[in-house]
């Protein structure tokens, strides 16, 4: 069995290098778009033939993210495997890695991160500050933890959750029974609520040589647990920014494997920094980097998984990213109106993901706006978002 050796000469081989990606959503699409610029071929594994990445990939394997035989096929047809979704089958990927197939980030890292209780336990063991947490074993243990942590407290499904869909804030004791039933018997954990003054994130990349580089600190504003706006640079002190980068790089240094990682953190009023979650892939809060940085998070991910030199990101201008979400009460086909008006605004870039169906609060695209300063970019972004409307067909 021939396993290609990925090196700095990888782009000069006789045929194009092939990256296999588990997941064909918007992240896979944007990885593929950067890959095409470098003459790299992309093979997608996704259950939907009309997934966003299908329009820019060279081949698509139609299968569930956890399908072992499909993952093996992806490995046979690719030079390196990565993933854009935590739902990938980490056990199947561990087997491939043991057979010398290049899989990045490490399946061991994926296995740690895709279970939130396991992830938080790992971080705590590595002396990285996280909220107090514990596993919920029964309604009695939930009541006990709510008493210990105080309310509000955050109940989280440990697996198969994303975009806040696995989170539920418990605000009073009389809501404990319905909160316990909310996840229908799934493995859950309770976290002590952190009264933060800022939510921030940092994209950090590492290659197989151990080189680590960080992007600027981003400030995130959420609405109903889904990212609404990202502001770069974050409106925090220089001291907090330096501390956040050190913590983010320490976090990634404790994990195995190459790639790009998103580290979400809370900043408290006394400027303590607490790690919330890690994403072992490109992240929504890093989309601004396409227009606002010298290297995007997607190109950096490609560099990392191919063990190419990483580029130190430089921020060209303050930037704001806002998501375009599906309407609350609509499932089905849709149109996006207001594009002409939107594109009349200076320094606005529009990204439409090409999803065929809208679902409540589903990410359908995003807008990135740059400005001479943060406040100008925020005002311009708010003006731009008012012009966009997603309507049902």
Give residue ranges: language-model regions.
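ATP-binding N-terminal substructure of ATP-dependent carboxylate-amine bond-forming enzymes
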Residues: 1-114, 118, 125, 140
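Peripheral (often C-terminal) accessory segments that flank ATP-dependent C-N-forming ligase machineries
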Residues: 7, 15, 303-393
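A conserved helix-loop-beta module that forms one wall/lid of the active-site cleft
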Residues: 107-168, 173
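Internal nucleotide-binding/catalytic subdomain
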Residues: 166-270
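Short, well-ordered beta-strand elements within core beta-sheets of diverse protein domains
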Residues: 192, 287-290, 367-370
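Active-site "cap" helix and flanking loop/linker of ATP-utilizing ligase/carboxylase catalytic domains
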Residues: 243-263, 269, 279-331
């Amino acid at each position: 069995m021939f396993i290609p050796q990925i090196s700095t000469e990888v782009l000069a081989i006789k045929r194009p290098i092939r990256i296999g990606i588990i997941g064909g959503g918007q992240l896979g699409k944007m990885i593929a778009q950067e890959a095409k610029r470098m003459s790299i071929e992309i093979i997608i594994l996704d259950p939907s033939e009309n997934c966003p990445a299908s329009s820019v990939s060279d081949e698509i394997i139609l299968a569930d993210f956890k399908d072992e035989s499909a993952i093996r096929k992806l490995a046979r047809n690719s030079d390196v495997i990565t993933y854009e979704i935590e739902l990938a089958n980490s056990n199947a990927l561990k087997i491939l890695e043991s057979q010398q197939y290049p899989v990045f980030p490490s399946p061991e890292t994926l296995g740690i991160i895709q279970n939130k209780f396991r992830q938080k336990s790992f971080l705590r063991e590595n002396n990285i500050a996280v909220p107090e947490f514990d596993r919920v074993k029964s309604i009695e243990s939930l009541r006990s933890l709510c008493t210990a942590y105080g309310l509000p407290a955050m109940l989280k499904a440990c697996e198969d959750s994303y975009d806040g869909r696995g989170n539920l804030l418990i605000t009073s004791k009389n809501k404990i029974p319905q909160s316990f039933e909310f996840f229908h018997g799934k493995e859950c954990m309770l976290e002590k609520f952190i009264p933060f003054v800022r939510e921030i994130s940092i994209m950090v990349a590492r290659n197989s040589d151990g080189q680590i580089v960080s992007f600027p600190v981003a400030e995130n504003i959420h609405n109903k647990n889904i990212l609404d706006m990202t502001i770069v640079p974050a409106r925090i002190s220089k001291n907090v920014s330096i501390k956040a980068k050190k913590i983010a790089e320490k976090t990634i240094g404790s994990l195995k494997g190459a790639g790009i990682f998103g580290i979400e953190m809370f900043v408290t009023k006394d400027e303590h920094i607490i790690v919330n979650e890690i994403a072992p892939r490109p992240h929504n809060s890093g989309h601004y980097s396409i227009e606002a940085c010298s290297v995007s998070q997607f190109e950096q991910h490609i560099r990392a998984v191919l063990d190419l030199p990483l580029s130190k990101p430089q921020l060209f201008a303050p930037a704001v990213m806002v998501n375009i979400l599906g309407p609350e009460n609509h499932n089905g086909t849709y149109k996006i109106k207001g594009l002409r008006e939107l594109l009349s605004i200076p320094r606005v870039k529009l990204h439409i993901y090409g999803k065929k169906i809208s679902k409540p609060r589903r990410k359908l695209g995003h807008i990135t706006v740059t400005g001479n300063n943060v406040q100008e970019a925020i005002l311009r972004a708010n003006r731009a978002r008012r012009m966009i409307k997603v309507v049902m067909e």
